[in-house]
C-alpha cells in the first residue's frame, strides 16, 4: 500500500497558531474514522479512541465514520465489544463502503443513530479463512471458522431484527446492498443527504 501522508490543519487560538494532524483534529469533535482494512493495529487505535472519548464525556455521542472493506474478525469484534462497552452512544456513518466486518460495525451503532451516505455500499457474508497443516489442525480451524460464522450471524440478527434463517441464507455468499436496501434490511436507520449530524463546524445543517 502506498504511503499516504497525514494532512495537518492549523487553528488560531488565544495563544497563537496550533497545528493538528487531521485524525487528532477530528477526535476533538468526537469523530473517529475507520478508513482502512481492519487488523489488530487498527483495532487497537479505534478502541483507544473510544475509551478516551468516554473518559472525556461519558454522556456525549461518539461518531464513528466507516469506509472499510472489512478484515480480521477478532480485531473487528474487539471494536464491536468496545462500542457496546462504553457508556457513550456510538453513532455509525458509512461513507463509501462497509463490507464484511465493516458492515457488522456499522449495524452495531446506537439504535436510531446508524447512517449511510446515499452512494454507500454495504456487504455482508460469512467469514473467510485458509488453513494448512495436519488434518487435526485443519479440523480445529474449521470448527473455529464455523463458530465465528454463527457469532457474526447472531450479531446481525440482534441488531437488524432479521430472522436467523434469512441471515444465514444471505451471508452464505457476498450479499451487496445500497443505502436504501441496507435501511430496509435494518443495518442502518437513515440515509444522510444532506448532512445533518456531526461535523467540524460550529453549526450543523438542517
From Swiss-Prot:
Keyword Amino-acid biosynthesis: no
Enzyme class: hydrolase
One Pfam family recorded for the sequence: CLP_protease
CC annotations in GO: cytoplasm; endopeptidase Clp complex
SUPFAM superfamilies: ClpP/crotonase
Subunit architecture: Fourteen ClpP subunits assemble into 2 heptameric rings which stack back to back to give a disk-like structure with a central cavity, resembling the structure of eukaryotic proteasomes.
Protein name: ATP-dependent Clp protease proteolytic subunit 2
Amino acid at each position: 500500500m502506498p504511503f499516504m501522508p497525514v494532512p495537518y490543519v492549523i487553528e488560531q487560538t488565544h495563544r497563537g497558531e496550533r497545528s493538528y494532524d487531521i485524525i487528532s483534529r477530528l477526535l476533538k469533535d468526537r469523530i473517529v474514522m475507520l478508513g482502512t482494512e481492519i487488523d489488530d493495529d487498527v483495532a487497537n487505535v479505534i478502541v483507544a479512541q473510544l475509551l478516551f472519548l468516554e473518559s472525556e464525556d461519558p454522556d456525549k455521542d461518539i461518531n464513528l465514520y466507516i469506509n472499510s472493506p472489512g478484515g480480521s474478525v477478532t480485531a473487528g469484534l474487539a471494536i464491536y465489544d468496545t462500542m457496546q462497552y462504553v457508556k457513550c452512544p456510538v453513532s455509525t456513518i458509512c461513507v463509501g463502503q462497509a463490507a464484511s466486518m465493516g458492515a457488522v460495525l456499522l449495524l452495531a451503532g446506537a439504535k436510531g443513530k446508524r447512517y449511510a451516505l446515499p452512494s454507500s455500499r454495504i456487504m455482508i457474508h460469512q467469514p473467510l479463512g485458509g488453513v494448512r497443516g495436519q488434518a487435526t489442525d485443519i479440523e480445529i480451524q474449521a470448527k473455529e471458522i464455523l463458530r465465528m460464522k454463527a457469532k457474526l450471524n447472531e450479531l446481525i440478527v440482534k441488531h437488524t431484527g432479521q430472522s436467523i434463517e434469512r441471515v444465514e441464507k444471505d451471508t452464505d455468499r457476498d450479499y451487496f446492498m445500497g443505502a436504501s436496501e441496507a435501511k430496509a434490511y435494518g443495518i442502518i436507520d437513515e440515509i444522510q443527504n444532506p448532512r445533518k449530524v456531526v461535523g467540524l463546524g460550529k453549526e450543523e445543517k438542517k
